[in-house]
Structure formats: structure tokens, C-alpha cells
Amino acid sequence: FASALEEARADLFGLYYIADPKLVELGILSDKDAYKAQYSNYIRNGLMVQTNRIELGRQITEAHMQNRQLIAMWCYEHGQKHNVIGKKVKNGKTYFVVNDFEALRGLFGELLAEIQRIKSEGDYEAGKNLIMRYAVDIDPELHKEVLDRYAALGLKPYGGFVNPEIVPVEKDGQIVDYKVEYPDDFLGQMLHYCHKYSVL
């Protein structure tokens, strides 16, 4: 349970602070409402989209995926009294909509505090209960709907990305600048990582 809880702690920290007005003041975010796109995306992914990677009838076993469902499901359940996240069905398709972004941020903060408490105190039972209640099981009807909707799109369930590499520029043995280089393709990047970092 430790890995999923640590992933949740990290995500919750980011989710909570991405809505801080200081990020706009510093110019990191362009708009005070920019965080809302991330909140909506995170909830949608945690409650639905990510399950397209799992066979129907199976549980979530991967720590990152457990973390996302834990956060989204916990917030959905704990926000129901005030309809923080709404579940809507339109034309046979299910949608989750964030109705109150400020309240959702508050829920992220509450869950972050609880997970930090669990980790700091070593409260194994509380951690286990969070994971088993919110992070493992998938609603079979919703899961089937996600798989059917995703199949119609013809998309792969996983995506990859190419990372830039920052390379120092030297002159007379001194670093005078840095340049950004990109690998030719994803496979080349992964083979480079294998060659360079496999001993770690």
C-alpha cells in the first residue's frame, strides 16, 4: 500500500498547490482559472479514462492508477453532500463534472492531510483501508462503458513522450551555455536510457 499512498501524497500536493494564486503572481500560470482544466482532467481520468487499460473484471493493481482512482473516488464520495463532483448520463454516456472547484481543492487538502498523517504515524490499517475501499475495485458497468467508448476511438491505451536533453556547451573547458536536444524517436530515447542508466 505504501507505493500507492506515496503517489497519492505527491499528486495531492501538486493538485492542491496548482490552484494557489501565487502561481499566477509568479507568472507560472497564465490565468487564475487555469488549474480548473487539470482538476477536471484528473477527476475524469481517475474515475473513468484510465480503466481502459484494464481487462473487464480485473482490479486496479498498479500504484499510479490506484492513486488516481483513490483521489478521484474519495473526493467524489466526500463531496456528494454538496455536489462537488456530479455524475451525469447523457445519451447513454457517463460524464463526471466538477461543479465546485474551490470545494474540490479543499477535499484535496483534506485527503493530503490524512495521507500525510498515515505516512508520518505509520498507520498501516488506515492506509490499507483507504486503498482497499477507494483504489482497487472498478464499477463493472462503468468499466464496460469506458472500454466500449475507447474501442470506438481506435486509440492505444498508453501514450509515450520524448524528453528533451539539456546539453552543456563548452568553450576552452568552461561551460558557457546549454542547448536543448531531442532524441530522433521514442525507441531511441528508451534505448539511450537503458544504455546510460541501467546500472542505477
Task: List each model region and its residues.
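Active-site-flanking segments in enzyme catalytic domains
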Residues: 1-3, 119
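An active-site-proximal "capping" alpha-helix that borders the catalytic cofactor pocket
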Residues: 3-20
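Mature, folded catalytic cores of secreted/periplasmic enzymes
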Residues: 5, 28-34, 54, 147, ...
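Long, well-structured alpha-helical subdomains associated
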Residues: 15-118
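Non-catalytic terminal regions of proteins
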Residues: 86-200
